[in-house]
Amino acid sequence: MTREGAEAIEQTSQRAAETPFARLVRHCVERILHGGGDSSSDELDFGIATMLGLLAMPGAFATIFLLDKYGSFFRFLRGEGKFDAYAASLPDEYFFIVLAMVVTGAVAIWKWDSLIPDHRDYANLAPLPISSRNIFLANLTALLLLTGVLALDVNAASSVLFPLMVCGSESSFAYLLVFLGTHLLSVVLASIFSFFVILAILGLLMAALPYRVFRTCSVYVRCAMAIFLMALLSTSFAMVRFVQNPSAASQLLMKLVSPLWFLGLCQSLRGVAGPAFASLGRFAVVGLATALILAVGAYALSYRRCFTQSAEAVANLPSTGGVAGEHFFRSLDKLFLKTPFERACFRFSLRTLSRSESHALIVGGFTGLGIVLASQTLFEAARAAPHGSTSPSALPSVDLLSVPLILGYFLLLGVRFAFDIPVLLRANWIFRFTVNPETGECVPLARKIMLTFLIPLLLIVCLPVCVWRWGWSMGVTHTAIVAVLCLFLTEILLVRFRKIPFTCAAPAFKSSALVTVVFYFLGFAIFTSGTSTAERWALEDPLRYLVVVPALAGAWLILRRYRGEMTELDTRLTFVEQPDTAVEVLDLTFRR
């Protein structure tokens, strides 16, 4: 290509990028990525480069963890002979398809409010000399572009590393290309299918329900979809074993699991699919086309109703909680909300959690993850239970004892994480002017908010189920132990807490964030497996409680002593969380 031709192409592309429609598409892309509000809303958000990097990480790490399975050196050490890459990689192929659907679906759920134009877009775009048809086409184009970019980015690392790892011992380059191409096509189409299904659900709900009803049920629908995605991911390994040994009655169930469709498509393209997988591959093509048609149709219906008629729409929920809500708060005032600070901030916090979709989604997501892991633990405990161990007189296993601890851990962790995400940060001036920063009431307030979520779990779920399963003595004892351990976890999570929930700027990303995540995983293992093992050990001989109880009391005293030795600066109320300085200087020259 000549220099003049390259310059002509560059000028043509620049002119195309400056057309009104291209600018409108760019505006729609930025609105979807950064939300519909103003840039100073201080919500949890990421830059484009950071977000794309984070989305590619799960697939990359999952591939690295498979090195010991597919590495030729490790297979040589294990004494493995002939290696069939297609058969050996079938479980992991299904896992990567599920992972692609889960990550893409999670992004669609998180950006739920930004996928379809709302009243803010109507206020900004309707007065301009732009037809509604062009606005609709620009939004649709932006959605299709982001869907493609998202599907490619989520699977970029795994689509290269996984085929190279599996086919590393193969001498044929064509074999690698076939494996890579079929894997890439399957996971990308699975990601697109997941995004379109969620978009179709969103559009159908917005088109069918009144706006207030949609806003009310939106959080519950998103939490339900998040729980479904987590359940799909957590059961991926069991599903592959089920597919490898199918029965006649399981053929219908296989057709209802959408990730199996794309696994069948992948195997069909490779030419190694049996009759069952070949039929599932046809389901993938039909399902993807159906999801695309439903998504575009539902998007058009919801666009017409929620954008062109959004001048009459009300974006906020009612400001009052009704008579029942007032009675609830008055009852809590008499029980344990003693000071005006606690009463006001408690109402503010609960109403934030119930009305803010982002905060409710955080708590619901953590709780949903706890439900999935608890259900999986319960299933494994029931399957591993020997004959005769299901009688009420038998001692419960360690897995059964850990189920309520898993639920409590993720519920408390979700509420604590939501505390750090601000809501309308510019409105915290009322707290700055009216609250004395020296009162030290932040920890008691946060503790009571977390107990408000914990107590129903203990009294409505844990106690009745344990009493029904093991009788009053064992049920009350186990519920009391769970309550004490959850209280101890609450105190640990609030050790350095010195803010009013939802009023402090979100903490910046720190280099120690990965270490914090590792500590959360270790804490989960200790809090669930460690404590349930100690409880099971004590149940075998009640005298062993003389060891368990003093150990727990000693840990409690250590925590109280650590909190008592904190300086006034560490307990003073703050509204701006200062990042840790990388380098501390003494300033011995006293220069100013």
Segments the model singles out, each with a brief description of its role:
Residues 145, 205, 428:
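Anion-coordinating catalytic cores for phosphoryl-, nucleotidyl-, and glycosidic chemistry
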Residues 60-63, 80-82, 99-102, 112-118, ...:
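Nucleic acid-processing catalytic cores of prokaryotic defense/repair systems
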Residues 107-128, 415-432:
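Transmembrane helix boundary and interhelical loop/hinge segments in multi-pass membrane proteins
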Residues 132-164, 438-466:
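Selective transmembrane-helix segments that form parts of the transport pathway or gating/packing helices
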Residues 85, 112, 127-141, 145-149, ...:
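Structured, mid-chain assembly/scaffold modules that mediate subunit interfaces
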Residues 125, 135, 214, 360, ...:
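Alpha-helical transmembrane segments and their helix-entry boundary regions
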